[in-house]
Structures are given as C-alpha cells and as structure tokens.
C-alpha cells in the first residue's frame, strides 16, 4: 500500500506544470535569503518544532533569533528546502533524505503540516501571493509531504 501511495505522490510531483514550478521557484527565490526570518516564523507558529532541536529547547525565541547558531541552523533548513525547490519536479532523493533524518526523531505529520502553514504565512507577507502562487505551492507541498508521509 505504501508503494502505491508513494507512486501516486511522485506522479503528482511530476504532474506539476512548468508554470507551477516556475511560480514556486521564483517566489522562493524572493525569500530564500531570509532563512532566519523563515525559521523564526516556523518556531513562532509551532513551539514544538523549536523544542525538537536540543540546542534551542527552553530558550527565548527572540533572544536566539540573532545568534550565529540560529542563523546556521536556519540556513541548513532553508537550504534543504531550496534543494527541493531547485530540483522540481524530481523530489525522490529529498524525500528519502528528509525521512532518514526526521523519522528517527519522531517528527509528526502535524509538525510537518505546521511547518507548511507557517512557511506559507511567511510567503504571504513577503511575495505577491496570488491564487496561482497558492495553487502552485499547494501542489508542491502536497506532492512532497505526501511522499514523505507515505514513508513515515
């Protein structure tokens, strides 16, 4: 059953139109330089995500936001997302990498969905978030997280 779900998710990623891929890549290009702001928005929206990182447990988010450790970690997370976006519609290797690092840590589907919601909220405040952009990002996250969830 998981194979069928995964096959459907990969097919969905492959079904992203060139226009959708272009919209996702261009809007991401406008925000990828603000990795600290993106991670801050994610942690602010769901403190359980911040609590999943031992170096940030129990620390005041506003106090750590300006630190080098936070900036480095934000760069890793946003960089990984950038790799997914750059490789669209080919998400397979990124799915396996994310599952390999997040499944053993007990990251939940809810936390992934909260990451998605916080990232989208961040995007809405920083790009021209049209209906077409919304549909493109929705299809991208549906395909990527659908494939991740099938393996978790």
UniProtKB/Swiss-Prot annotation:
User: NADP: present as a keyword of the record?
Assistant: no
Q: Which UniProt keywords apply?
A: Heme, Iron, Metal-binding, Oxygen transport, Signal, Transport
Q: Which residues bind heme b?
A: 73, 102
Instruction: Look up keyword Heme and say if it applies.
Output: yes
GO CC list = extracellular region; hemoglobin complex
Q: Signal sequence span per UniProt? A: 1-15
Entry superkingdom: Eukaryota
What is stated as this protein's family in its record?
Belongs to the globin family.
Q: What is this protein called?
A: Globin CTT-E/E'
State the organism named in the record: Chironomus thummi thummi
